[in-house]
């Protein structure tokens, strides 16, 4: 039997937590008097850190900005963290796990937190659509491959 078959991939969620929260409504209360037709912008970012052998922290940063014309109605940022035990994978598989699989787990928690903050700011309910982190990760890999090819051509 080969060594590859004897090593199983293990994955466990140790903890999911809110690392940082920020909510700003810089133009309140005047913004409440305006017709509510906001332009909503969503920004996502992930970061991962190895804490110990086989233990990783993944942080998903979600920033939502709602603007009415040139005025910011609200700005909400949540950093949702998770500690995961991951063994038996490496390389691109590990990068996919940390950059797509773990953020997929964290996003519903961040989304709920943002929805709650926006509601507490007395703005209309904000329902963020699910995010396909697998597609975002594949785009990232393609972008990195393209940049690597450009650097290779320049040499």
Swiss-Prot record:
Protein name per UniProt: Protein-export protein SecB
Keyword ATP-binding: no
Cellular compartments annotated: Cytoplasm
GO cellular component: cytoplasm
GO molecular function, one term: unfolded protein binding
Disulphides: none
Pfam families associated with the record: SecB
UniProt cross-references to PANTHER family, sorted A to Z: PROTEIN-EXPORT PROTEIN SECB (PTHR36918:SF1), PTHR36918
Record organism: Klebsiella pneumoniae subsp. pneumoniae (strain ATCC 700721 / MGH 78578)
């Amino acid at each position: 039997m080969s060594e590859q078959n004897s090593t199983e991939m293990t994955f466990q969620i140790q903890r999911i937590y809110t690392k940082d929260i920020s909510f700003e409504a810089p133009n309140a209360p005047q913004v409440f008097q305006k017709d509510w037709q906001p332009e909503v912008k969503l920004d996502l970012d992930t970061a991962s850190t190895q804490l110990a052998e086989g233990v990783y922290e993944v942080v998903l940063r979600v920033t939502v900005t709602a603007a009415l014309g040139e005025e910011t109605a609200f700005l909400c940022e949540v950093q949702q963290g998770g500690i995961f035990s991951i063994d038996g994978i490496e390389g691109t598989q590990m990068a996919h796990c940390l950059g797509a699989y773990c953020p997929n787990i964290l996003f519903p928690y961040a989304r709920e937190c943002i929805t709650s903050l926006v509601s507490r700011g007395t703005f209309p309910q904000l329902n963020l659509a699910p995010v396909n982190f697998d597609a975002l990760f594949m785009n990232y890999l393609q972008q990195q491959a393209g940049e690597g090819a450009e650097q290779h051509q320049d040499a």
